[in-house]
Amino acid sequence: MTKQARRRLIPFLVIIAASSVVLVTFFSRKDNTTQDLPEQTTTVATRDVVTPAPIVSTTNTSTPAEATPSTTEDSTGNSTKDSVQDSTDASALPAPFDVLQVMQHALKDTPLTLGSLENLEKWKLEAHFTQTGAGIQSIRFADIFETVDGKLAWNNFRSDGGEQPSIEEMYLLVDEQTVNEKIVPALGAYKIVINDQELNLSSASDWQVSSIRSDGIHFIATIIDEHKTEIAKVHRTWTLDNQFGLQLSQSIHNLTSQDVVVQWVQYGPPSLTVDRSRYMDRRRFRFGWELGLDGHLAPIQSNDVVLEFADAIKERSDTIWPTVDSIEENDKLSWFASSNRYFAIATFPNITKEGEGTRLFGDKVEKITTVVDGPEGSETVLTGLYSPETTVSGGGIYDISMGIYAGPLERSVLDTEQPYMALNLRDLVLYQMSSMCAICTFQWLADFLAIVLTLLDRYVVFDWGFSIIILVLIVRTILHPITKRSQINMQRFGKVMQKLKPEIDKLKKKYPNDPKRVQGEQMVLMKQYGVNPLQMLGCLPMFLQMPVWIALYALLYFMFDIRQESAFFGVFQMIGDWPFLADLSSADHFFGTFENPVQFLFWNITGINILPILMGGIFFVQQKYMSPQSMATSPEQESQQKIMRIMMVVMFPLMLYSAPSGLTLYILTSSTVGILESRRIRKHIDSVPIEPNVAQPDEIGRKPKDKQGRAWADAMEARRKKVQNKAKKRSFKKRD
């Protein structure tokens, strides 16, 4: 072969070889991904490296004790990694495997259940698991019910026997979802990425049920190459304590002698069911994190980031953690939860019963995403938990275990038991309305009212209804001095306005086309008689009670302790199972309940209620006693005031028609006490003559002694100077 021919042949052979490598690489990749969760797009600069555990079994599938991952532990009992090193150098990355796949297994018909609905002394719930994704099929509580009727039926059955009520009456916390004709269990596995090869683990045949015991259910998924050689195993073991806690012990075992880079992706807590009445949809996604304080232990924060369900469904897919602010502040994730009005599912790192262990979740969950499915009005939000890319050394184990809380938002549990205390999960209990009312709801005030109501119920009157009435008396007593002063000021103001009415009429006739002049002269007259509108504090007691009403609204709406609790020792339920005030957290249902809620405007009406109607009548009567003297200076203003009074009588009851009956009971009682208080103050005023205080000529220029009077005088003086300055500007003329 000539030299010239070799120069032509060698490049041709190199091109053929390179093309062959590209084609083999392209056609040998197997796509196992699905589109249920948004793909991770963030890159990770460094990867954790997990070195081999002391003992690693590559074929262990017999019992949970043998198959459960064995990791090294520190003094606190938490699994640790032997070493972590920087592996940013591309040449140091593990070599790619051939085509990987998931070993398939036969389906089992055996029930996969932990807990019980019958043994109340031992279990609080019953959890069903599924081979699909080795996740949770459903969780149902044993002693928490959907409705008051269901609660009464089951309590009667358990005490007196008879026909067993339906299991459907017990509260269903979570159920598997069907998305695009595919079953999605809660907290089920989604996929694993090994050396950039994505392997779907969401099918039932991907998992082998290794063992079923009363204290745990163990699943195994095996990753093999094209030669059927086992490359890795994924272990998932579910256990249940005797309260509302579950433990998910899961790990990835590298069965080879070389390093592999893995990333774990699973489903997180989904959106929970909405309340039956749907008065307000308060489903939320919550986060707890430690502040980035250079490794120092910091309080776990949570209330600054609350993702409402209504905001989550605006985007069909989104990344909800980390946020822009959390990246800037270097916040470290500690827990993630999905909640509705009364319940929550939270995931968090492993912490012992003594509250010891790391509170950081970042080595297991680096990113959280959402996907929205379902038609408008019936959306479901699925969440995805992405682990960081981690290098697992040959024979090593990557532990991705986590704890789970699946229970009520009850502070007696979250504020007194571990590991919830260490993680500050008590902040899941948030007595706060959303949207515009969020800034009006003072969390500290709602917490204080919760303490007062709880003390009254447990140690004083032993009934939530009477506790609310006593709370009314406490608040009205505190506000009585202000109420009395406002009533006296209202009476004095009314008498002065009656005496000044002829003078004001003269001013209107004198300046018919200059209302500002009339208003200014009227202010001068009021100043001469020692009164001003700021002294008329007739609405101040109501405004001071508004924060209490809003805080109490949020408290009674979200407080689990009041859920399905009756008022006045259940006396109304003794009359033929009358549902009136059977549940202070829902409407009063004076005329019974509807089997299916009826849609009306923004609410689902669950029954016909009487307390809001009585509240409207009380408001009307209250205006007769506490309305201040009208300051209308024109027919238009007078008609506007009438409209406002009518709206208060009509709109308040309409807005609160489906509100918790505990709140309407509070407002109704407070308004009734206010009328009686007003009558007593009026009798006191009538017995003491109150005459207008006419200012002396030498006192007209002096400022009043009271704060309101001084503020009024300063405002009038500033207004007078402003008018004078404008008059001077208008009188200036430019000469030619």
Each predicted region: which residue ranges?
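Conserved catalytic motifs of ABC-family nucleotide-binding domains
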Residues: 554-618
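Hydrophobic core segments of alpha-helical transmembrane domains in multi-pass membrane proteins
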Residues: 612, 616, 662-671
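Membrane-protein biogenesis/insertion across secretory and organellar systems
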Residues: 1-473, 477, 688-736
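Core hydrophobic alpha-helical membrane-spanning segments
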Residues: 11-25, 552, 613-617, 650-651
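Transmembrane helix interruption/hinge and helix-loop junction motifs
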Residues: 461-463, 654-664
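Juxtamembrane "helix exit" motif at the C-terminal ends of alpha-helical transmembrane segments
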Residues: 22-27, 453-458, 547-567, 621-627
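Membrane-interface starts of transmembrane alpha-helices
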Residues: 460-471, 607-611, 637-644
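Membrane-interface amphipathic helices and adjacent TM-edge segments
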Residues: 250, 395, 477-552, 619-657, ...
